[in-house]
């Protein structure tokens, strides 16, 4: 595994060859729900305009790109790790597991895997960790969009089940509103019990 910081156009050209997969995660910070990862192999003959780090895109733009990625990419796969797995393994190792699941779910075996961040799990193929890769490599940008939309939809579904928690607004992140809901309404089965605010609410 190589960790690449400040990637140059020449390095991009060297590693973005063959059926390479971009991988990214969403949901390491929230107090509730799955950590969600996605793996995407784009079609160089069917480009998608406007790809970028999902955090820099509006919800409407993410939804539009989500549909385009599903339609135009050669392969798209989502992998998750549950709150129970996060509590058992810790969030870092659970995220690595979710990434492995996403790559394993691709219907094309990638020639290499490019991951946003500073580390990758073992995928059984060449892999590169690219710092800020979600804004530099289109396949990683696409993966960040897929993972973000999937997780946001999971939070919206949870908001319908537990409307008093406001998950549709804060998406499970540790906001003041979430802390107040924990205090007033208690811990849900979907909360991550190993995260300190949840642990303190259980005490």
From Swiss-Prot:
Q: Which CDD domains match?
A: RNase_HII_bacteria_HII_like (cd07182)
Pfam families named among the record's database cross-references = RNase_HII
What are its GO cellular component terms?
A: cytoplasm; ribonuclease H2 complex
Q: Name any cofactors this protein relies on.
A: Mn(2+); Mg(2+)
Could you tell me what reaction this enzyme catalyses? Answer: Endonucleolytic cleavage to 5'-phosphomonoester
Which Gene Ontology terms cover its molecular function? manganese ion binding; RNA binding; RNA-DNA hybrid ribonuclease activity
Describe the location of the RNase H type-2 domain by residue ranges: 18-203
Q: What biological process terms from GO does the record include?
A: DNA replication, removal of RNA primer; mismatch repair
Q: What EC number is given for this enzyme?
A: 3.1.26.4
| Family to which this protein belongs | Belongs to the RNase HII family.
Function noted in UniProt: Endonuclease that specifically degrades the RNA of RNA-DNA hybrids.
Q: What is the protein's given name?
A: Ribonuclease HII
Organism, as annotated: Shewanella halifaxensis (strain HAW-EB4)
């Amino acid at each position: 595994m190589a960790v690449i910081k400040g990637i140059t156009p020449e390095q991009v050209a060297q590693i973005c060859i063959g059926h390479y997969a971009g991988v990214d995660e969403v949901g390491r910070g929230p107090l509730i729900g799955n950590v969600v990862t996605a793996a995407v192999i784009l079609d160089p003959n069917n480009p998608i305009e406007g790809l970028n780090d999902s955090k820099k895109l509006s919800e409407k733009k993410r939804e539009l790109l989500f549909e385009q990625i599903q339609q135009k990419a050669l392969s798209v796969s989502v992998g998750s790790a549950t709150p129970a797995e996060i509590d058992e393994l810790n969030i870092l190792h659970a995220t690595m597991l979710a990434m492995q699941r996403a790559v394993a779910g691709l219907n094309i075996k990638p020639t290499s895997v490019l991951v946003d961040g500073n580390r990758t799990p073992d995928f059984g193929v060449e892999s590169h960790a690219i710092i800020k890769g979600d804004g530099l490599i289109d396949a990683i940008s696409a993966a960040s969009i897929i993972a973000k939309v999937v997780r946001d939809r999971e939070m919206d579904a949870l908001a319908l089940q537990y409307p008093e928690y406001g998950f549709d607004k804060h998406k499970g992140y540790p906001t003041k509103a979430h802390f107040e809901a924990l205090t007033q309404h208690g811990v849900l089965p979907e909360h991550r019990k190993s995260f300190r605010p949840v642990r303190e609410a259980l005490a």
